[in-house]
Amino acid sequence: MQTVRMTTAQALVKFLNQQYVEFDGKQQKFIKGIFTIFGHGNVVGLGQALEEDAGELEVYQGRNEQGMANAAMAFAKQKHRKQIMACTSSVGPGSANMITSAATASANNIPVLLLPGDVFATRQPDPVLQQIEQTHDLSISTNDAFRAVSKYWDRINRPEQLMTAMIQAMRVLTNPADTGAVTICLPQDVQGEAWDFPSYFFQKRVHRIERRLPTKASLADAVEMIKRKKKPVMICGGGVRYAEAAEELKQFAETFHIPFGETQAGKSAIESSHPYNLGGIGVTGNIAANTIAKEADLVIGIGTRFTDFTTASKQLFQNEEVEFVNINISEFHANKLDALKVIADAKEALLTLIDELQVIDYRSSYTVEIADAKEAWETELSRLHNIRFTGQDFTPEVEGHFDGNLNEYVDALGSQLTQTAVIGQINTLLDEDAIIVGAAGSLPGDLQRMWASRKPNTYHMEYGYSCMGYEVAGALGAKIAEPSKEVYAMVGDGSYQMLHSELVTSLQENKKINVLLFDNSGFGCINNLQMGNGMGSFGTEFRYRNQETRKLDGAIMKIDFAASAAGYGVKTYHVTSLEQLREALIDAKKQTVSTLIDIKVLPKTMTNGYESWWHVGVAEVSKSQSVQAAYESKVSNLQQARSY
């Protein structure tokens, strides 16, 4: 048996270079590169291996471990899970910073390979710098926290353990049914230890992502259920995009006259103008999709996890005879809502169902309902685009909260811009193939409802974990995945302040991204939630501490985000009017460096809900009558919702 003497880290790098995936006959390198932040826990081990021979891996320098791992996840998401990035950090706080990103990737079923440094396997220098000592178990380190948020976790305590660990890692990373974060912990001493690795460990490996076919029995059951139903609706989930099944879904909708709503992950699989595309569905959905869904007697979920935002906490589907067919590669997700399960690749399942339903000449009984619903939403969308602040007589979309003191925000922000009007203009002015990236705050709701996707795969929303601070890093990852397209991070001031470190990396790599920063001086989405459930405004506006009340109810904070970003070398713009916004967007397209447009918008001018409800933990007992009323409303809504 031929062997090669290498360190554990060197063997890991060589192995990663030999991994390929094949999908529909197309073969490509699986691991494009590796994001790094070096510290004592990885620099002389994995760092040395990368310096000596990185192979074809592109080595990127991150600025924050969570940021770079978010970028890695966004890259894989934009690549539809067919190519990924790895990330390496030092021990302790460096590795802990990636835990949030691991959770984000696993919640979204997006593959990312995390390689955190770890404490010494020998324990000789214990406690090493940045080590946590647990007196009840000395084998525990910070990296054990990854267990809860990883789809596969391992620790390499001996060099030869690397082989089985990495084979299992690749199994999970290339498994569409159960992929997510894979964490391989690398004790810093073991990284540098040498071993005689068998040459066959480094052979080229092609991981074929196969399309699972539906069984005849599940297919027959699905056909039997569908043919009994008159008003079905489909839900286009992220699985449609990852399985590249958009054309088949369109064919299914057109052939059988069945409309579909979109989840955050599924949006832009098919252009918004398609006659059967109702748009966003659920809590952050629009009036068209939610109206049709309420009356549907069959819900066909395609590649969706049926989150509470999709089902409106299982209260959306109000037809007493409603049943569910779930087409999903994952048996776990297919099993939800007591559905009839079709465990299969979305494309293969749809193609087979098309053949079977054509035999019986099936067609839904919709007449004008689909067109009427879409027309109603287009009318509402036009209204949202044209909302303008008019002074004291102005009623914001989210009314009854700040109605009396919006002028205070007008003065503080120096702007009368409404968020819905801003989004409308941005949607009009961006290139058709531009990619928008979002994750948290009020923007995901506005974008799922309002954004018209004119080209496929241009809407990139991380809403499986709704990770605050994902947006800027996510834009960088999407730009690395699609360097020829303009990429825009759609981010609020709250999320931007949490994390925007990889804006600097975008400059370093000459990967131009555009940050569209909506500043309403607060955590506006959560302020809506608390006040909508009977509370006052508490801890969600960005105000100075009042020296008299000792509370955060002083003057509104004024932050010049453009000036801050300009210090990095970003091209920046201040926007307080639609004309300034138009000029900034046009000029930003001409730039070769990353840009940031600081857009001051009034709070409460985002969209509000449409025919949906969201279950949150309202206080059962309170001195506040408004909180008591909110609790009673919750109880009433729960009576209309499924129990599971």
UniProtKB/Swiss-Prot annotation:
One of its GO terms (molecular function) is magnesium ion binding. CDD domains: TPP_IolD (cd02003), TPP_PYR_POX_like (cd07035). PROSITE patterns: TPP_ENZYMES. The lineage of its organism: Bacteria, Bacillati, Bacillota, Bacilli, Bacillales. Mg(2+) binds at residues 493, 520. It catalyses: 3D-3,5/4-trihydroxycyclohexane-1,2-dione + H2O = 5-deoxy-D-glucuronate + H(+). Residues 442-522 are annotated as: Thiamine pyrophosphate binding. Disulfide bonds: none annotated. Thiamine diphosphate binds at residue 65. Keywords: Hydrolase, Magnesium, Metal-binding, NAD, Thiamine pyrophosphate. This is 3D-(3,5/4)-trihydroxycyclohexane-1,2-dione hydrolase 1. Pathway: Polyol metabolism; myo-inositol degradation into acetyl-CoA; acetyl-CoA from myo-inositol: step 3/7. Involved in the cleavage of the C1-C2 bond of 3D-(3,5/4)-trihydroxycyclohexane-1,2-dione (THcHDO) to yield 5-deoxy-glucuronate (5DG). Its EC number is 3.7.1.22. InterPro entries: DHS-like_NAD/FAD-binding_dom, Myo_inos_IolD, THcHDO_hydrolase_firmi, THDP-binding, Thiamin_PyroP_enz_cen_dom, Thiamin_PyroP_enz_TPP-bd_dom, TPP-bd_CS, TPP_enz. One of its GO terms (biological process) is inositol catabolic process. Its cofactor is Mg(2+); thiamine diphosphate. SUPFAM superfamilies: DHS-like NAD/FAD-binding domain, Thiamin diphosphate-binding fold (THDP-binding). The gene is iolD1. The keyword DNA-binding does not apply. GO terms for cellular component: acetolactate synthase complex.
